[in-house]
Regions:
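N-terminal Rossmann-like NAD(P)+-binding domain of SDR-like oxidoreductases, especially those catalyzing
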Residues: 1-179, 222, 232, 313, ...
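C-terminal substrate-binding subdomain of Rossmann-fold SDR/epimerase-dehydratase oxidoreductases
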Residues: 17, 23, 30-31, 57, ...
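A short local structural element in Rossmann-fold oxidoreductases
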Residues: 66, 133, 184-185, 254
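Short, solvent-exposed loop/turn segments at secondary-structure boundaries
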Residues: 91-92, 148, 183-187, 294
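Heptad-repeat alpha-helical coiled-coil signaling segments
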Residues: 178, 182-185, 213-217
Length: 332
């Protein structure tokens, strides 16, 4: 039986990845920080909490990482732990940098020194591209991050490449573009929209958002974790862009959600109102980022050709999943 350890197992990607690995017969270890409150709601909804063995880990302490690996003896290590909210990274740049960079260095050092046969996956991000130099973005596109989050992730990405090339480790990075799901955190715009609209049906409180013209390449997290697994099943390690290759504006996303909920609306500029003139969606300057990234659209051709990765979802099915989940949680 293969064994895998997942940091960030209680997050969106961690939950879906754990479910995938369990379905493939893995023994799954969920690594978590001690005293984090053990927020398992995603794992509970996915019905897998009892199938995961949890281990406490401190990515800031190499000795602790070594002890965990001594105990688990994993075949694969998926590092998904991160402070992943871009907006918060401007408010907490130090915490974001330490969390998203130092931990990766410590993991790679322990693997290099003691467990060089472990296959390692690092969660990189399209936010590393930032001020883009070409569209669509691919594995060779130059990075120009526009947030502390993107900067920290770029460091970890290059570090993973360096350890692969310098020490012959099986270390891969997945440059994942935006991926959503019913398990997305409520601080992210897609989930803020789906949950907010479901609540609007009940209380009429409008959803406040930032720049509705921002474009994103949105996929489904369930598809993207399969790509993570596929990377570690190859004969040689490499880095891959995981994306849909299509973009939509936040306004597009809103319209599809309103249609899914069968809400009648009229739209003028960045405002959406119902038939009585009441706000459904309105903008608030406080939700606009200090530095917005340019058009992010990924080129997934390498992953499709080399990994034979085939996403099962499109934007419509993603939105349907998210809306139905929030209706079930909060009631229509």
């Amino acid at each position: 039986m293969k064994k895998a350890i997942i940091t960030g197992v209680t997050g969106q990607d961690g939950g879906y990845l754990a479910k995938l690995l369990l379905s493939k017969g893995y023994k799954v270890y969920g690594a978590q920080r001690r005293n984090t409150g053990k927020r398992y709601w995603r794992l509970d909804e996915l019905g897998i909490t009892d199938q995961i063995e949890f281990v406490d880990i401190d990515l800031g302490e190499p000795y602790n990482i070594e002890k965990v690996l001594d105990k688990v003896q994993p075949d694969e290590f998926y590092n998904l732990a991160a402070q992943s909210f871009v907006g918060l990274s401007f408010e907490q740049p130090q915490v974001t940098t330490i969390t998203n960079s130092l931990g990766v260095l410590n993991i790679l050092e322990v693997i290099r020194n003691k467990y060089p046969k472990i296959k390692f996956y690092q969660a990189s991000t399209s936010e590393m591209y930032g001020k883009v130099t070409e569209t669509p973005q691919k594995e060779t596109t130059r990075f120009h991050p526009r947030s502390p989050y993107g900067c920290a992730k770029a460091y970890s990405h290059y570090l993973t490449i360096n350890y692969r090339e310098s020490y012959d480790l099986f270390a891969c990075s997945g440059i994942l573009f935006n991926h959503e799901s019913p398990m997305r955190g409520e601080e992210f715009v897609t989930r803020k929209i789906t949950k907010g609209l479901v609540h609007w049906l009940k209380n009429g409180k409008p959803v406040e958002l930032g720049n509705l013209d921002s474009k994103r390449d949105w996929g489904h997290a369930e598809d993207y974790v399969e790509a993570m697994w596929l990377m570690l099943q190859q004969d040689t390690p490499d880095d891959y862009v995981i994306a849909t290759g299509k973009t939509h504006t936040i306004k597009d996303f809103i319209v599809k959600c309103l249609d899914e909920l069968e809400i009648t609306y009229f739209n003028e500029g960045d405002e959406f109102r119902d038939n009585h003139g009441n706000f459904i969606i309105k903008t608030n300057p406080k939700f606009v980022r200090p530095a917005e990234v340019d058009l992010l659209i990924g080129d997934p051709m390498k992953a499709r050709e080399k990994l034979l990765w085939k996403p099962k979802h499109n934007l419509d099915s993603l939105i349907k999943d998210m809306i139905q989940a929030d209706l079930k949680r909060y009631g229509k």
